[in-house]
């Protein structure tokens, strides 16, 4: 085949300003979805199918070295090495739980986010972060106490999946399953980073990416309603909603974004999402953390059932996972059981989530990472004399 003499493009081709440092920076191919990858190859004078070949090497085989891609000719490999790279964030620390859960501290610049691998008998779920810290200040969540620094880039989101897949693929231990499910339930609010989360989701579900079913990719949100509508128009994935309270007065206190988008507005947005989605099979998952004598009474169970009567859903009750400095307690098993029974009497599918990885601070609500807080939230807490949680890493 005759090779094109088209000059190699500058490193800014097909990459958004957010994911480009300067004109001399190589393009990180992990920042590109398939459409962008094809645009890059066309700009190089290559056929679009070359992008598909490269994506298979990157995501099916977890290769990051162009020279290992044996069905790519040497001239194209040389071109790619000049202008591009495949660079996933590195693991700075690994912790293993007695229950098989693995938590990785992932280095992103001078900071760290956390990614969790949760193996089960019939699946293996990867919990992925979307931001360095979180801006939403949910009172029961360790991540929220660290403040917020920045959004993760596409390569830093999909790179968590790539890095985990490479590590798990290399493990020869019995029972280590490949990743079957991804949940955007790590550090950060995914809907506040849609510009990077959406391309990452597209790569997760692309046949030339990780090829996951849309029913096995879940985005969790605390209720950024306008962004929920944008997500519905952009990509179809399973949805989980962090509700955590049956009434606005309680939710205003523990999930402060409720003061802007209250429960009625949130659930209206959820029903609009369900109407557009096939991935959810007609219902969403409601996440409800169980806080002792805060939101776990029998009366509140009845209130929750009334609140959700027009929203097709299943309900996950999550025993709260403690972290240092938190002002809450975990609901007792008896209170959780009573709460669950009330919901089931109303006909709701209700599951009490099994706690995984709490011995390594990898359970729901415990992820902390290492965040340089741009919101000055921790400073404000010190000045006000409020308790401050200790980082898990």
Swiss-Prot record:
It is found in: Cytoplasm. It comes from the Bacteria. PANTHER family: 23S RRNA METHYLTRANSFERASE, RADICAL SAM CORE DOMAIN-CONTAINING PROTEIN. Disulfide bonds join 127-364. Its EC number is 2.1.1.192. One of its GO terms (biological process) is rRNA base methylation. This is Dual-specificity RNA methyltransferase RlmN. Belongs to the radical SAM superfamily. RlmN family. [4Fe-4S] cluster binds at residues 134, 138, 141. GO terms for molecular function: 4 iron, 4 sulfur cluster binding; metal ion binding; rRNA (adenine(2503)-C2-)-methyltransferase activity; rRNA binding; tRNA (adenine(37)-C2)-methyltransferase activity; tRNA binding. The keyword Iron-sulfur applies. InterPro entries: Aldolase_TIM (IPR013785), Methyltransferase_A (IPR040072), RlmN_N (IPR048641), RNA_MTrfase_RlmN (IPR027492), rRNA_lsu_MTrfase_RlmN/Cfr (IPR004383), rSAM (IPR007197).
